[in-house]
Regions:
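Alpha-helix-loop-beta-strand connector modules within alpha/beta enzyme cores
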Residues: 65-83, 140, 144, 247, ...
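Conserved, mostly hydrophobic/aromatic
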Residues: 13, 46, 50, 72, ...
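Hydrophobic faces of well-ordered beta-strands that scaffold small-molecule active sites
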Residues: 11-15, 54-56, 80-85, 110-114, ...
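Glycine-rich, proline-tolerant flexible connector loops at the mouths of alpha/beta enzymes
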Residues: 53-72, 228-233, 366-379
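An alpha-helical appendage that flanks or caps ligand/catalytic pockets
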Residues: 2-19, 120, 126-127, 133-198, ...
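Acidic (Asp/Glu)-rich catalytic clusters
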Residues: 5-8, 44-48, 70-78, 99, ...
Length: 398
């Protein structure tokens, strides 16, 4: 049984930035190109709606997350960019320096999403030698994050006015530091990076449902991300994670706090009937051939969380993909990743989110189609209701 893990935690909400295009339909060509102007509009709408950050995706047709993150942070004041690092595809020290730069220039708003990869095709295109080695990718990620942490926390940093070359940087090293030497990364000296505004460093977000993913998250993540699933499934995921966290605590004596995050879609309308009609409309233009092609692609994944999405879709296909009250898996016919849609009135959507929060979820990354209009609608109608309900329930518990 999962106790309420959010008794003293604030709930954070983020939105998704559609850097591969946007529109009113899923599984067909985008109606809106991911221009700089449009992405800034979505980011500003999310900020105005009361959403604290934006997840900037990576892979395939997505525009580079770091370039987009740099652009949108210069056009917003409080919105935080959650950008992706890809262990093995860039060096950990370079990623740490990029993260420090983004954190400095944004005034301490940088957030880091650790992506080991779920699409074998994408990993092959990127030349990842571990494209077909799921557990080894997480083993590598563990070392990668350790190096990033060392770069951020075990030096005094390199201030812009002090850049005098490698020898000058070396004089700032702590004599007690030891160079990192692991299976995937070896260094002959301790590594350095510019100073970060956030201490000890920008937060890590990491997802994955496999035991290896949970182990890395227990050790390094500030937020462990899960893709949307029925509430009972999420309860089991959290219970499994707590077992891994307990084992890590027994082995190391370290008890790290980790928050739980949920990635899902939302669709809010005035009536439940309107909402369900709008949900089916999202996939109304998809051809049977496109669905078949998507299913074949999803079946090739070695990612446990995508396999769970596939299983959920198949298990509930005779129920028209309704996997729980106001929960719909229909988008997963053609959309990979966190495709579960929370669909209904503002009251119903906020109530389903409350139920996830009562399980221990304290970070929500949401999206809807089109992302601009749905950010505005969610922020105006459902988000205030959530905050009202959550505050009321916390008062009752107090």
């Amino acid at each position: 049984m999962v106790n309420n893990l959010n008794e003293h935690k604030e709930i954070e909400f983020g939105w998704f930035l559609p850097t591969a295009g946007d529109g009113s339909y899923v599984g067909v060509a985008s109606e809106r190109e991911p221009t700089l102007e449009y992405l800034i509009d979505v980011a500003k709408a999310a900020e105005k709606a009361g959403l604290g950050f934006v997840l900037i995706p990576t892979g395939g047709p997505c525009l580079d997350a770091w370039v987009v993150g740099s652009a949108i942070m210069s056009h917003t004041t409080t919105l935080r960019p959650l950008v992706a690092v890809r262990p093995g595809l860039t060096t950990p020290v370079l990623s740490a320096r990029m993260g420090a730069a983004l954190d400095q220039l944004s005034g301490g708003r940088a957030m880091i999403n650790v992506v080991t990869g779920s699409s074998v095709q994408d990993l092959e295109e990127l030349g990842d030698p571990l494209a077909h080695a799921h557990d080894k990718r997480y083993e590598r990620a563990s070392e990668y994050l350790a190096v990033m942490q060392q770069a951020w926390t075990q030096s005094d940093g390199i201030k812009a006015s002090e850049f005098v070359g490698s020898e000058g940087a070396e004089t700032k090293q702590n004599d007690q530091q030891q160079p990192f030497r692991g299976k995937y990364y070896q260094f002959t000296r301790a590594v350095t990076t510019p100073l970060t505004v956030q201490k000890p460093h920008p937060p890590f977000y990491l997802g994955g449902s496999s035991p290896s993913a949970k182990r890395v998250a227990v050790e390094f993540a500030d937020t462990y991300l899960m893709w949307g699933e029925p509430h009972d499934w999420i309860r089991e995921q959290i219970e499994d994670f707590e077992v891994v966290r307990s084992q890590y605590r027994e082995e190391t004596g370290i008890d790290r706090p980790v928050r739980f995050g949920l990635r899902a879609q939302v669709l809010v309308r005035d009536t439940e009937e309107e909402a369900w009609a709008a949900a089916w409309e999202l996939i109304s233009k998809v051809s049977p051939e496109a669905i078949e092609q998507a299913q074949k692609a999803f079946a090739k994944t070695d990612a446990t969380n995508q396999r769970r999405q596939n299983e959920l879709r198949e298990q509930f296909k005779d129920e028209r993909f309704v996997v729980g009250p106001n929960l719909w898996a229909g988008l997963s016919l053609v959309r990979s990743g966190g495709a579960i849609l929370i669909v209904g009135t503002a009251d119903q959507v906020s109530e389903r989110l409350i139920e996830y929060a009562e399980l221990g979820v304290s970070s929500f990354i949401l999206s809807g189609y089109p992302h601009l209009e749905e950010a505005e609608r969610f922020g105006k109608e459902a988000l205030p209701l959530f905050h009202q309900k959550w505050a009321s329930r916390r008062e009752v518990r107090a």
